[in-house]
Amino acid sequence: MYNTSKLFNSTTYLTNDGIQNTDSHMMKNIEWGAVAYLKQSIYGLGITDITINNNSSYYTGGGTGTSYKTNIGQSTSGNITGVYDMSGGAWEYVMGNYNKQAGDSGLTVSGVPAEHIDIYSGTSVAASHLGDATGETAGWYSDSAIFVNSSNPWFPRGGYFFSNDAGVFSFGDYAGEVSDHFWFRSVLSVKE
């Protein structure tokens, strides 16, 4: 998942003019938190809970074609320009990890640059990082709040399409296994 996200920085995906000024990586836990807080702000839905994407085929925006236009409640902003699938659909792994343990991911965690991963030294929300939308928001909107540990060292975010505790502030603990129920989100950013 991490290595796949890094591929977006290759010339296959970007123009020759822009490739030196971009960074692609798998979304970090704190980056998920930033989007979650934006949803909670006046620029997003505010205190209105985001609608769960309950599409069992995991389609972005809750369906095919133009369904994203009618399912704007699934967007962080309440309109089509927001970020979709932050609640429900499939769990989305982020680069949030307990104690540099690989679990079932197959990733050499120690080889991941520090700017691309959030490492947690504890197994409760007391070990959260300020801004990652775990400790400070645990349980908001009745979203899942299960912290990483030695058996399940990876954070997935958002929750399942069929789960009542799915939501933008939902987080869980999993081993890093590949599954059709677990996806990931890539980030492409501009370097200064």
How should these model regions be labeled?
Residues M1-M86, V190:
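Short aromatic-cysteine micro-motif
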Residues I30-G33, T60-T64, Y68-G103, T108-E192:
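C-terminal, surface-exposed recognition/capping segments
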